[in-house]
Regions:
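Non-heme Fe(II)-dependent double-stranded beta-helix
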Residues: 1-114
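Catalytic core of non-heme Fe(II) oxygenases with the double-stranded beta-helix
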Residues: 99-163
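Conserved metal-binding segment of the jelly-roll/cupin
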Residues: 164-178
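Non-heme Fe(II)/2-oxoglutarate
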Residues: 181-251, 258-275
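Structural detector for internal amphipathic alpha-helices that build alpha-solenoid repeat scaffolds
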Residues: 222-242, 259-274, 284, 292-307, ...
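Amphipathic alpha-helical scaffolding segments comprising HEAT/armadillo-like alpha-solenoid repeats
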Residues: 242-254, 273-287, 306-331, 354-365, ...
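Short inter-helical turns and helix N-cap capping residues of alpha-solenoid HEAT/ARM repeat scaffolds
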Residues: 256-257, 289-290, 319-321, 337-338, ...
Length: 509
């Protein structure tokens, strides 16, 4: 197999800031024409034939797309070398004259149940087998919007059409705001969407890296460099640098112009002393009505280190609301989001790291509202080296009455080193009454991998769960555990779940 063609520093910085890249496979046009014909046969005239999550066995040629060196290199670069494919797959048709979709984010946990990742943990590939110019209804994305949960302001963050040539694909951050655009032509437009998950925390760059400096040439409409620089350093496994900054326009923090507020925040974020000096003003910006400013301010506060912790912890502790989110699908972000200040604070505390752990543990155990406890669980998961105390607290949180808290605690355990306590807690969580908690537990066990051998009996049962994603993650977990016992548990399920791509209504045997 040809070696993956990794992204460059410039491409990675574009992805971090903009949230997407346009790339093209190396496969010939004849391959893409064949895929187009198969897609047309499946859903070109009858959406009822859409194979949904069975797309890959229905069109096994698509495995060549994911074996392509450009695709493998892009995914290796943004989600690490041992990424896995999510069990959800989607084939989308944009027929002639089809209306545009609403701008949305995808979700399996409900719109606000799970805290959205800023770090590059999930990515999507949107592949098209035909040329997709603007008039044919490409995917539209809002550059830089992966760092906000509320729908972006159109005037501040304009949409970009992800136009692609034949065999092209969009690589997007899972949490970017996007939509299907209107097809003005008489031609069909097909797009398939696959999702990929990081399985290991980065300790070094996984792309073609040569220059540690942040040198983004063309930023998106809103400059969140306080956020971007930290994502860059996290992906490199590198510490954040303290850079003395002269002539900071601190008055810009109070400007009515959002670009001036961001410019001041970004300058302050580069310098520890400046962040300490302007901490009260930054803390006030956590409640800015524009979410990008609140988020950028939280990252700038992280530059102040432990000095910023009381302000950030107080914002989370002061959120006493219950985290009720019955919406299980995508949402257009139009409803009010009172949890924005506390969520922004959680991102800042995650960046501060280990000094924030005691305060977060207290909120996780004693927070008056489930939203605060959820945010504490999330931030603890993002912080490396929380130790036995952190793992034990997250294990206890698996018993929280709020499904949102349990889901975030379960996910956090998957980001920690393997431990008997975590594996036991996750094995029990695979039987949680909430389906999202169950599939999050199976994914966390997959991330732990060989250290989760004790979970084999629970994972064997999970293969037959009524929720379609629990078995998908259980398969990944058993494969990654890879002991003879894990393989013996896995093979009978795979044999009965086998799909024959050669069988159709026209040829049933």
């Amino acid at each position: 197999m040809t070696a993956p063609k990794l992204l460059t520093d410039a491409q990675m910085q574009h992805f971090i800031a903009h949230g997407y890249l346009r790339l093209r496979t190396e496969l010939p046009d004849s391959f893409h024409r064949g895929v187009y014909q198969q897609f047309d046969t499946l859903i070109g005239t009858d959406a009822a034939l859409n194979p949904g999550n069975n797309l890959l066995p229905a069109v096994p040629e698509l495995n060549q797309v994911f074996a392509d060196p450009i695709v493998r290199g892009a995914l290796t670069s943004v989600v690490g070398p041992d990424y896995v494919m999510h069990p959800h797959r989607a084939l989308h048709n944009n027929p002639p004259g089809s209306d545009a979709q609403r701008i949305h984010k995808d979700s399996y946990w409900g719109y606000l149940r799970r805290v959205r990742n800023h770090r590059s943990r999930w990515a999507m590939i949107m592949y098209v087998p035909q040329a997709t110019p603007l008039e044919r209804g490409p995917t539209g994305v809002i550059p830089g919007s992966q760092y906000q949960s509320q729908r972006p302001d159109d005037a501040l963050m304009p949409e970009v059409a992800g136009c692609l040539e034949t065999g092209g694909f969009l690589l997007i951050h899972y949490d970017i705001w996007h939509r299907k655009m209107k097809n003005f032509t008489e031609d069909k437009r097909f797009m398939m969407k696959f999702e990929f998950i990081r399985m290991q925390e980065p300790d070094s760059p996984s792309w073609d890296h040569s220059d540690p400096a942040w040198r983004l040439d063309e930023p998106p409409a809103l400059n969140l460099s306080a956020v971007w620089r930290r994502q860059w350093n996290w992906l490199r496994g590198a510490p954040n640098q303290d850079v003395p900054v002269n002539d900071i326009d601190a008055a810009g923090l109070a400007s009515s112009n959002p670009h001036q507020r961001l410019a001041a925040i970004n300058d302050i974020a580069r310098c520890t002393e400046a962040a300490r000096a302007h901490r009260p003003a930054l803390a006030a910006l956590l409640r800015d009505p524009l979410e990008p400013i609140a988020v950028d301010a939280a990252y700038a506060m992280a530059s102040a280190g432990p000095d910023a912790m009381p302000s950030l912890l107080d914002v989370i502790q002061g959120d006493t609301e219950e985290d009720l989110d019955p919406d299980r699908g995508s949402h257009d972000g139009s409803r009010p989001d009172p949890g924005m200040p506390a969520r922004s604070a959680a991102y800042g505390l995650a960046e501060i790291g280990l000094p924030a752990v005691p305060g977060l543990l207290d909120i996780l155990s004693n927070g008056a509202g489930s939203r605060a406890r959820k945010l504490a669980a999330f931030a603890l998961g993002e912080i490396a080296g929380t130790g036995t105390e952190g793992i034990e607290a997250l294990c206890r949180a698996k018993q929280d009455p709020s499904a949102a808290v349990r889901i975030n605690a379960i996910e956090a355990l998957g980001l920690k080193p393997a431990s008997p306590a975590a594996v036991a807690a996750l094995s029990r969580a695979v039987k949680d009454p909430d389906p999202q908690a169950r599939f999050s537990a199976a994914l966390s066990l997959a991330q732990i991998g060989p250290g989760a051998e004790a979970a084999i009996p629970a994972l064997k049962d999970a293969l037959y769960d009524e929720n379609r994603y629990v078995p998908g993650y259980a398969v990944e977990a058993l494969e990654r555990i890879a002991t003879p016992g894990a393989i013996r548990a896995l093979l009978p399920f795979l044999k009965t779940a086998r799909w024959c791509p050669h069988t159709s209504p026209a040829s049933i045997y």
